[in-house]
Protein backbone atom coordinates (compact mmCIF):
# COMPACT_ATOMS: atom_id res chain seq x y z
CA UNK A 1 0.00 0.00 0.00
CA UNK A 2 2.78 2.48 0.85
CA UNK A 3 4.36 2.10 -2.60
CA UNK A 4 1.04 2.91 -4.23
CA UNK A 5 0.57 5.85 -1.87
CA UNK A 6 4.04 7.24 -2.63
CA UNK A 7 3.26 7.20 -6.36
CA UNK A 8 -0.05 8.94 -5.74
CA UNK A 9 1.43 11.63 -3.49
CA UNK A 10 4.37 12.30 -5.83
CA UNK A 11 1.75 13.06 -8.47
CA UNK A 12 0.14 15.60 -6.11
CA UNK A 13 -2.91 13.43 -5.48
CA UNK A 14 -4.42 13.47 -2.00
CA UNK A 15 -4.98 10.20 -0.11
CA UNK A 16 -8.38 9.37 1.33
CA UNK A 17 -8.87 8.59 5.02
CA UNK A 18 -8.85 4.79 4.67
CA UNK A 19 -5.74 4.61 2.49
CA UNK A 20 -3.83 6.95 4.80
CA UNK A 21 -4.77 4.80 7.78
CA UNK A 22 -3.43 1.71 5.99
CA UNK A 23 -0.15 3.44 5.11
CA UNK A 24 0.32 4.73 8.66
CA UNK A 25 -0.35 1.24 10.03
CA UNK A 26 2.35 -0.16 7.72
CA UNK A 27 4.81 2.43 9.06
CA UNK A 28 3.88 1.98 12.74
CA UNK A 29 3.94 -1.83 12.53
CA UNK A 30 7.39 -2.00 10.92
CA UNK A 31 6.13 -3.24 7.56
CA UNK A 32 7.60 -0.32 5.57
CA UNK A 33 11.30 0.09 4.78
CA UNK A 34 13.28 3.18 5.79
CA UNK A 35 13.49 4.19 2.13
CA UNK A 36 9.72 3.92 1.76
CA UNK A 37 9.10 5.90 4.96
CA UNK A 38 11.54 8.63 3.89
CA UNK A 39 10.02 8.85 0.42
CA UNK A 40 6.49 9.01 1.79
CA UNK A 41 7.28 11.69 4.38
CA UNK A 42 9.16 13.84 1.86
CA UNK A 43 6.47 13.50 -0.80
CA UNK A 44 3.75 14.38 1.73
CA UNK A 45 5.71 17.44 2.83
CA UNK A 46 6.09 18.62 -0.78
CA UNK A 47 2.42 18.01 -1.62
CA UNK A 48 1.06 19.39 1.62
CA UNK A 49 -0.95 17.30 4.08
CA UNK A 50 -4.76 17.46 3.97
CA UNK A 51 -7.09 17.50 6.97
CA UNK A 52 -8.15 13.89 6.24
CA UNK A 53 -4.54 12.72 5.92
CA UNK A 54 -3.51 14.33 9.22
CA UNK A 55 -6.64 13.05 10.97
CA UNK A 56 -5.98 9.50 9.73
CA UNK A 57 -2.33 9.49 10.83
CA UNK A 58 -3.18 10.97 14.24
CA UNK A 59 -5.92 8.38 14.71
CA UNK A 60 -3.45 5.53 14.12
CA UNK A 61 -0.89 7.08 16.47
CA UNK A 62 -3.53 7.37 19.18
CA UNK A 63 -4.59 3.76 18.67
CA UNK A 64 -1.01 2.47 18.85
CA UNK A 65 0.16 4.43 21.88
CA UNK A 66 0.19 3.38 25.52
CA UNK A 67 -2.57 5.31 27.31
CA UNK A 68 -3.29 6.78 30.69
CA UNK A 69 -6.86 7.47 31.74
CA UNK A 70 -7.34 10.67 33.77
CA UNK A 71 -10.36 11.05 36.02
CA UNK A 72 -10.92 14.65 34.86
CA UNK A 73 -10.60 16.69 31.68
CA UNK A 74 -6.93 17.46 31.02
CA UNK A 75 -5.12 20.05 28.94
CA UNK A 76 -1.92 19.90 26.90
CA UNK A 77 0.20 22.91 25.98
CA UNK A 78 2.39 22.01 23.06
CA UNK A 79 4.04 23.30 19.91
CA UNK A 80 4.92 21.54 16.70
CA UNK A 81 8.46 22.86 16.88
CA UNK A 82 10.23 23.70 13.67
CA UNK A 83 9.86 27.47 14.03
CA UNK A 84 13.69 27.77 14.16
CA UNK A 85 13.45 30.65 16.65
CA UNK A 86 15.36 28.93 19.50
CA UNK A 87 13.15 30.44 22.18
CA UNK A 88 13.18 29.03 25.70
CA UNK A 89 10.59 26.36 26.59
CA UNK A 90 7.57 28.65 26.87
CA UNK A 91 4.86 25.99 26.88
CA UNK A 92 6.64 23.81 29.44
CA UNK A 93 7.07 26.69 31.90
CA UNK A 94 3.44 27.68 31.28
CA UNK A 95 2.40 24.16 32.32
CA UNK A 96 3.44 24.86 35.92
CA UNK A 97 1.42 28.07 36.00
CA UNK A 98 -1.71 26.55 34.48
CA UNK A 99 -1.69 23.43 36.64
CA UNK A 100 -1.12 25.57 39.74
CA UNK A 101 -4.35 27.29 38.74
CA UNK A 102 -6.31 24.07 39.13
CA UNK A 103 -6.32 22.98 35.49
CA UNK A 104 -4.92 19.43 35.10
CA UNK A 105 -2.07 19.46 32.58
CA UNK A 106 -0.88 16.26 30.90
CA UNK A 107 2.23 17.48 29.11
CA UNK A 108 3.44 15.24 26.30
CA UNK A 109 6.84 15.70 24.69
CA UNK A 110 10.33 14.47 24.05
CA UNK A 111 13.92 15.52 23.61
CA UNK A 112 15.12 18.17 21.24
CA UNK A 113 14.49 17.54 17.55
CA UNK A 114 14.50 20.99 15.95
CA UNK A 115 15.79 23.10 18.87
CA UNK A 116 18.60 23.09 21.44
CA UNK A 117 16.34 21.99 24.28
CA UNK A 118 13.17 19.91 24.19
CA UNK A 119 10.61 19.73 26.99
CA UNK A 120 12.14 16.50 28.32
CA UNK A 121 15.60 18.07 28.36
CA UNK A 122 14.34 21.06 30.35
CA UNK A 123 12.45 18.99 32.90
CA UNK A 124 15.50 16.80 33.51
CA UNK A 125 17.64 19.90 33.98
CA UNK A 126 15.12 21.12 36.57
CA UNK A 127 15.55 17.86 38.50
CA UNK A 128 12.40 16.05 37.38
CA UNK A 129 12.55 12.31 36.76
CA UNK A 130 11.01 11.71 33.33
CA UNK A 131 11.76 7.96 33.26
CA UNK A 132 8.37 6.99 34.65
CA UNK A 133 5.83 4.38 33.68
CA UNK A 134 2.35 5.29 32.50
CA UNK A 135 0.98 4.18 35.88
CA UNK A 136 3.42 6.42 37.75
CA UNK A 137 2.62 9.43 35.58
CA UNK A 138 -1.09 8.81 36.07
CA UNK A 139 -0.54 8.75 39.84
CA UNK A 140 1.35 12.06 39.74
CA UNK A 141 -1.37 13.61 37.59
CA UNK A 142 -4.01 12.50 40.07
CA UNK A 143 -2.04 13.87 43.05
CA UNK A 144 -0.84 17.26 41.80
CA UNK A 145 -2.81 17.88 38.60
CA UNK A 146 0.21 17.70 36.31
CA UNK A 147 2.36 15.06 34.67
CA UNK A 148 4.87 14.67 31.88
CA UNK A 149 4.57 11.80 29.42
CA UNK A 150 7.91 11.12 27.74
CA UNK A 151 6.94 10.33 24.15
CA UNK A 152 9.22 7.29 23.55
CA UNK A 153 7.67 5.56 26.59
CA UNK A 154 4.20 5.82 25.08
CA UNK A 155 4.83 5.61 21.36
CA UNK A 156 6.86 2.42 20.95
CA UNK A 157 5.64 2.10 17.36
CA UNK A 158 7.41 5.36 16.52
CA UNK A 159 10.72 3.48 16.65
CA UNK A 160 10.29 2.57 12.99
CA UNK A 161 9.94 6.17 11.81
CA UNK A 162 12.23 7.89 14.34
CA UNK A 163 15.59 7.13 12.64
CA UNK A 164 14.24 8.27 9.27
CA UNK A 165 12.84 11.44 10.76
CA UNK A 166 16.19 12.21 12.41
CA UNK A 167 18.14 11.59 9.20
CA UNK A 168 15.79 13.75 7.13
CA UNK A 169 16.15 16.59 9.66
CA UNK A 170 13.34 18.59 8.02
CA UNK A 171 9.78 19.22 9.05
CA UNK A 172 7.52 16.28 8.28
CA UNK A 173 3.99 15.26 9.16
CA UNK A 174 5.42 13.87 12.41
CA UNK A 175 6.08 17.42 13.63
CA UNK A 176 2.33 17.81 13.42
CA UNK A 177 1.36 14.36 14.71
CA UNK A 178 3.17 14.33 18.04
CA UNK A 179 1.03 17.13 19.50
CA UNK A 180 -2.12 15.38 18.21
CA UNK A 181 -1.40 12.06 19.93
CA UNK A 182 -1.49 12.90 23.64
CA UNK A 183 -1.51 9.58 25.58
CA UNK A 184 -3.86 11.03 28.21
CA UNK A 185 -6.38 11.90 25.51
CA UNK A 186 -6.16 15.59 26.42
CA UNK A 187 -9.48 17.12 25.43
CA UNK A 188 -8.28 20.70 25.84
CA UNK A 189 -5.25 21.95 24.00
CA UNK A 190 -3.18 25.03 23.24
CA UNK A 191 -1.39 23.97 20.05
CA UNK A 192 1.27 26.18 18.49
CA UNK A 193 2.18 25.64 14.83
CA UNK A 194 5.17 26.76 12.76
CA UNK A 195 3.13 27.72 9.68
CA UNK A 196 0.08 29.97 9.55
CA UNK A 197 -1.36 27.77 6.81
CA UNK A 198 -1.69 24.97 9.39
CA UNK A 199 -3.78 26.94 11.89
CA UNK A 200 -7.28 26.28 10.57
CA UNK A 201 -6.56 22.77 9.20
CA UNK A 202 -5.22 21.59 12.56
CA UNK A 203 -8.18 23.14 14.35
CA UNK A 204 -10.40 21.03 12.09
CA UNK A 205 -8.27 17.94 12.79
CA UNK A 206 -8.69 18.50 16.53
CA UNK A 207 -12.43 18.83 15.98
CA UNK A 208 -12.37 15.53 14.03
CA UNK A 209 -10.48 13.89 16.90
CA UNK A 210 -13.14 14.93 19.41
CA UNK A 211 -11.27 17.61 21.34
CA UNK A 212 -13.64 19.61 23.55
CA UNK A 213 -11.83 22.98 23.59
CA UNK A 214 -8.68 24.07 21.78
CA UNK A 215 -6.78 27.02 20.41
CA UNK A 216 -4.39 26.55 17.49
CA UNK A 217 -1.99 29.49 17.32
CA UNK A 218 0.75 30.95 15.14
CA UNK A 219 2.69 34.14 15.80
CA UNK A 220 3.21 36.42 12.82
CA UNK A 221 6.90 36.50 13.76
CA UNK A 222 6.98 32.75 13.06
CA UNK A 223 6.66 31.48 16.63
CA UNK A 224 4.66 28.34 17.38
CA UNK A 225 3.35 30.15 20.46
CA UNK A 226 1.12 33.10 21.28
CA UNK A 227 3.76 35.76 20.70
CA UNK A 228 4.71 39.04 22.34
CA UNK A 229 6.60 40.27 19.29
CA UNK A 230 3.72 40.55 16.84
CA UNK A 231 0.09 39.62 16.25
CA UNK A 232 -0.98 35.98 16.69
CA UNK A 233 -3.45 34.14 14.49
CA UNK A 234 -5.76 31.99 16.65
CA UNK A 235 -8.31 29.39 15.63
CA UNK A 236 -10.53 28.42 18.55
CA UNK A 237 -12.41 25.13 18.78
CA UNK A 238 -15.36 25.27 21.17
CA UNK A 239 -18.71 23.46 21.37
CA UNK A 240 -18.17 21.86 17.97
CA UNK A 241 -17.53 25.21 16.28
CA UNK A 242 -14.42 26.92 14.92
CA UNK A 243 -13.78 30.65 15.29
CA UNK A 244 -10.72 32.49 13.93
CA UNK A 245 -9.36 35.79 15.23
CA UNK A 246 -6.18 37.81 15.72
CA UNK A 247 -4.67 38.74 19.08
CA UNK A 248 -2.09 41.45 19.68
CA UNK A 249 -0.08 41.80 22.92
CA UNK A 250 -1.52 45.28 23.46
CA UNK A 251 -5.07 43.91 23.65
CA UNK A 252 -4.17 42.21 26.93
CA UNK A 253 -1.99 44.99 28.31
CA UNK A 254 1.44 43.72 27.24
CA UNK A 255 4.26 45.63 25.57
CA UNK A 256 5.85 44.12 22.49
CA UNK A 257 9.39 42.82 22.64
CA UNK A 258 12.08 41.70 20.23
CA UNK A 259 12.35 38.02 19.38
CA UNK A 260 15.94 37.99 20.64
CA UNK A 261 14.60 38.76 24.14
CA UNK A 262 12.86 35.37 24.17
CA UNK A 263 15.81 33.27 23.01
CA UNK A 264 16.92 30.40 25.21
CA UNK A 265 19.83 27.99 24.97
CA UNK A 266 20.83 24.56 26.19
CA UNK A 267 18.92 22.73 28.97
CA UNK A 268 21.00 24.34 31.73
CA UNK A 269 20.33 27.83 30.36
CA UNK A 270 16.62 27.17 29.89
CA UNK A 271 16.31 25.73 33.40
CA UNK A 272 17.83 28.94 34.74
CA UNK A 273 15.31 30.98 32.72
CA UNK A 274 12.43 28.85 34.00
CA UNK A 275 13.50 29.28 37.62
CA UNK A 276 13.91 33.04 37.18
CA UNK A 277 10.35 33.29 35.86
CA UNK A 278 8.86 31.07 38.58
CA UNK A 279 10.79 33.02 41.22
CA UNK A 280 9.09 36.23 40.09
CA UNK A 281 11.56 37.93 37.72
CA UNK A 282 9.85 40.47 35.47
CA UNK A 283 10.37 41.03 31.76
CA UNK A 284 9.39 39.69 28.34
CA UNK A 285 10.13 36.04 29.19
CA UNK A 286 7.72 36.16 32.11
CA UNK A 287 5.17 38.08 30.04
CA UNK A 288 5.04 35.49 27.25
CA UNK A 289 4.56 32.71 29.83
CA UNK A 290 1.74 34.71 31.42
CA UNK A 291 0.17 35.32 28.00
CA UNK A 292 0.21 31.65 26.97
CA UNK A 293 -0.92 30.52 30.42
CA UNK A 294 -3.82 32.98 30.28
CA UNK A 295 -5.18 31.43 27.10
CA UNK A 296 -5.08 27.99 28.72
CA UNK A 297 -6.89 29.23 31.81
CA UNK A 298 -9.44 30.95 29.56
CA UNK A 299 -10.19 27.66 27.80
CA UNK A 300 -10.63 25.88 31.10
CA UNK A 301 -12.87 28.29 32.99
CA UNK A 302 -16.30 29.52 31.97
CA UNK A 303 -17.50 33.11 32.24
CA UNK A 304 -14.06 34.63 32.72
CA UNK A 305 -12.33 37.13 30.44
CA UNK A 306 -8.87 36.84 28.95
CA UNK A 307 -7.78 39.89 30.95
CA UNK A 308 -8.95 38.16 34.14
CA UNK A 309 -6.91 35.12 33.12
CA UNK A 310 -3.82 37.29 32.65
CA UNK A 311 -4.23 38.56 36.23
CA UNK A 312 -4.75 35.00 37.46
CA UNK A 313 -1.56 33.79 35.75
CA UNK A 314 0.42 36.68 37.24
CA UNK A 315 -0.92 35.91 40.71
CA UNK A 316 -0.06 32.22 40.36
CA UNK A 317 3.56 33.19 39.71
CA UNK A 318 3.80 36.03 42.26
CA UNK A 319 2.20 33.98 45.05
CA UNK A 320 4.74 31.19 44.56
CA UNK A 321 2.04 28.69 43.58
CA UNK A 322 3.64 27.90 40.20
CA UNK A 323 7.07 27.40 41.80
CA UNK A 324 5.48 25.19 44.46
CA UNK A 325 3.97 23.09 41.66
CA UNK A 326 7.45 22.57 40.20
CA UNK A 327 8.79 21.52 43.60
CA UNK A 328 5.94 19.03 44.09
CA UNK A 329 6.63 17.57 40.66
CA UNK A 330 10.34 17.19 41.41
CA UNK A 331 9.63 15.47 44.73
CA UNK A 332 6.94 13.11 43.47
CA UNK A 333 8.73 12.12 40.27
CA UNK A 334 11.84 11.19 42.23
CA UNK A 335 9.90 9.17 44.81
CA UNK A 336 9.68 6.25 42.37
CA UNK A 337 12.58 3.81 42.16
CA UNK A 338 11.42 2.05 39.01
CA UNK A 339 12.92 3.37 35.81
CA UNK A 340 11.52 2.93 32.35
CA UNK A 341 14.19 2.09 29.83
From Swiss-Prot:
Write out the similarity annotation: Belongs to the anthranilate phosphoribosyltransferase family.
What is this protein's function? Catalyzes the transfer of the phosphoribosyl group of 5-phosphorylribose-1-pyrophosphate (PRPP) to anthranilate to yield N-(5'-phosphoribosyl)-anthranilate (PRA).
- Which ranges of the sequence are coiled-coil? none
Residues annotated as binding Mg(2+) 1: 91, 225
Q: What is this protein called?
A: Anthranilate phosphoribosyltransferase
SUPFAM superfamilies reported in the protein's UniProt record: Nucleoside phosphorylase/phosphoribosyltransferase catalytic domain (SSF52418), Nucleoside phosphorylase/phosphoribosyltransferase N-terminal domain (SSF47648)
- Reply yes or no: does the keyword Transport apply: no
| Residues that hold anthranilate 2 according to the record | 165
Give the binding site residues for 5-phospho-alpha-D-ribose 1-diphosphate.
79, 82-83, 87, 89-92, 107-115, 119
The UniProt record gives the binding positions of anthranilate 1 as: 79
Q: Print the organism lineage.
A: Bacteria, Bacillati, Bacillota, Clostridia, Eubacteriales
Instruction: Cite a GO CC annotation.
Output: cytosol
Subunit note = Homodimer.
Cofactors = Mg(2+)
EC number(s) on record? Answer: 2.4.2.18
State the Gene Ontology BP annotations.
L-tryptophan biosynthetic process
In which pathway is this protein known to take part?
Answer: Amino-acid biosynthesis; L-tryptophan biosynthesis; L-tryptophan from chorismate: step 2/5
Q: Which InterPro entries match?
A: Anthranilate_Pribosyl_Tfrase, Glycosyl_Trfase_fam3, Glycosyl_Trfase_fam3_N_dom, Glycosyl_Trfase_fam3_N_dom_sf, Nuc_phospho_transferase
What the record notes about the co-factor is: Binds 2 magnesium ions per monomer.
HAMAP family in alphabetical order:
TrpD
A Pfam family name for this chain? Glycos_transf_3
Catalytic activity annotation: N-(5-phospho-beta-D-ribosyl)anthranilate + diphosphate = 5-phospho-alpha-D-ribose 1-diphosphate + anthranilate
Amino acid sequence: MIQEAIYQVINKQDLDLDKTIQVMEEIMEGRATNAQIGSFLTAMRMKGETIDEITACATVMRQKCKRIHPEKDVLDIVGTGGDEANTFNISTVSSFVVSAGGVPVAKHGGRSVSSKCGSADLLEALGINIALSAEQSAEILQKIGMCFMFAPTYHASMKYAAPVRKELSVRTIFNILGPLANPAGANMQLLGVYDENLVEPLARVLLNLGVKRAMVVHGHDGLDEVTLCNTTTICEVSNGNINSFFLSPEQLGFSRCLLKELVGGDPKKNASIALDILNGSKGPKRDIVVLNSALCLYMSYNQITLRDCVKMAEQLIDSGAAKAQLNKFIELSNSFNQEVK
